């Protein structure tokens, strides 16, 4: 039996948006069963709600952004990843600005926030999206694919012509569970190259970026004094992003995901392609007295 989950208590955080550079106040609130993840722009009059829905994705350049009723919510992927990692189904995310705080560039601070708020089980079974048929999308040599699998596993391969990202450190696989997510994925930070800085600034991107919230590389090395948290932190962060992007499907995935040089745009294209093909997936749940789901979530954390 795996039940839906929400937060036990309301919790708040503040930070800056990675791309906007704006200070933002964020409040995470409990939500009822079947509510899902809903963002709320409390700085707007009237307040606008934006569901965490792959069909509302309008921005995929260096982040995943949603738009609903004229209101934007930018850089949702790291919080969505943490929610997926801890199995939180229902939550209200109030924001005082259009972009979520970047924190340290990983999902670790969001994991800590969620655990600090406490996570409680609710009265209805959790709903999973079970992959029944292979679905694949491509963009040039980039590939993102879902395949049937008993559980949830993710594999990712990146290709960067950089001495700090050799081929042997460009591949990562994870058999998803809360424990594996927290230990192996959640601390991996977003990264960027000095050579791309001008391109980003011209487009008003990365304005809040610094070595406090990203790994920064020049042509030869990592510039952060503390170095890397994992030897292959770069590809692990790509899995972190993918877990967040895929959670916009509206439920936890049961299947195998494979990404080759994929990013936010292709991940979103994959989710949309899946949802559009009704023969390729089904809703499943595991009510009391039935089989256990093939994915392990940590016991609820009662704060």
Curated annotation (Swiss-Prot):
The EC number on file is 3.5.1.108
Instruction: Tell me which GO cellular component terms the UniProt record holds.
Output: membrane
Q: Extract the Pfam families matched here.
A: LpxC (PF03331)
Pathway(s) annotated for this protein in UniProt: Glycolipid biosynthesis; lipid IV(A) biosynthesis; lipid IV(A) from (3R)-3-hydroxytetradecanoyl-[acyl-carrier-protein] and UDP-N-acetyl-alpha-D-glucosamine: step 2/6
Q: Where does Zn(2+) bind?
A: 78, 237, 241
- The active site lies at 264
Q: Which InterPro entries match?
A: Ribosomal_Su5_D2-typ_SF, UDP-acyl_GlcNac_deAcase, UDP-acyl_GlcNac_deAcase_C, UDP-acyl_N-AcGlcN_deAcase_N
Catalysed reactions, semicolon-separated: a UDP-3-O-[(3R)-3-hydroxyacyl]-N-acetyl-alpha-D-glucosamine + H2O = a UDP-3-O-[(3R)-3-hydroxyacyl]-alpha-D-glucosamine + acetate
Q: What class of enzyme is it?
A: hydrolase
For this UniProt record, give its keywords in alphabetical order, as a comma-separated list.
Answer: Hydrolase, Lipid A biosynthesis, Lipid biosynthesis, Lipid metabolism, Metal-binding, Zinc
Q: Name one GO molecular function term.
A: metal ion binding
A GO BP entry is:
lipid A biosynthetic process
Which coenzyme or cofactor does it need?
A: Zn(2+)
Family to which this protein belongs: Belongs to the LpxC family.
Its function, per the record, reads: Catalyzes the hydrolysis of UDP-3-O-myristoyl-N-acetylglucosamine to form UDP-3-O-myristoylglucosamine and acetate, the committed step in lipid A biosynthesis.
Protein name listed in UniProt:
UDP-3-O-acyl-N-acetylglucosamine deacetylase
Encoding gene, per UniProt annotation: lpxC
């Amino acid at each position: 039996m795996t039940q839906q989950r929400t937060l036990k208590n309301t919790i708040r955080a503040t930070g800056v948006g990675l791309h906007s550079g704006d200070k933002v106040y964020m409040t995470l609130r409990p939500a009822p069963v079947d509510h899902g993840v809903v963002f709320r722009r409390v700085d707007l009059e009237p307040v606008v709600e934006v569901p965490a829905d792959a069909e509302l994705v309008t921005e995929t350049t260096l982040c995943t952004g949603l738009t609903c009723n004229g209101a934007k919510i930018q850089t949702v992927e790291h919080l969505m990843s943490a929610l997926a990692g801890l199995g939180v189904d229902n939550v209200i995310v109030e924001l005082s600005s259009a972009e979520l705080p970047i924190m340290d560039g990983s999902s670790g601070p969001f994991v800590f926030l969620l655990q600090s708020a406490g996570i409680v089980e609710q009265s209805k079974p959790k709903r999973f999206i079970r992959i029944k048929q292979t679905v694949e999308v491509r963009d040039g040599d980039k590939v993102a694919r879902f395949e049937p699998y008993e559980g949830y596993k993710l594999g990712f391969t990146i290709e960067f012509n950089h001495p700090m990202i050799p081929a042997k450190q460009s591949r990562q696989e994870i058999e998803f569970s809360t424990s594996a997510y927290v230990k192996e994925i959640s601390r991996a930070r977003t990264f960027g190259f000095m050579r791309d800085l001008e391109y980003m600034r011209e487009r008003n991107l990365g304005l809040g970026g610094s070595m406090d919230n990203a790994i920064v590389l020049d042509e030869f090395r990592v510039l952060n004094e503390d170095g890397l948290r994992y030897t292959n932190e770069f590809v692990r962060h790509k899995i972190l992003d993918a877990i967040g992007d895929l959670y916009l499907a509206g439920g936890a995935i049961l299947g195998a995901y494979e990404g080759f040089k994929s990013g936010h745009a292709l991940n979103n294209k994959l989710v949309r392609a899946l949802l559009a093909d009704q023969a390729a997936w089904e809703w499943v749940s595991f009510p009391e007295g039935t089989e256990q789901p093939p994915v392990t979530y940590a016991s609820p954390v009662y704060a």
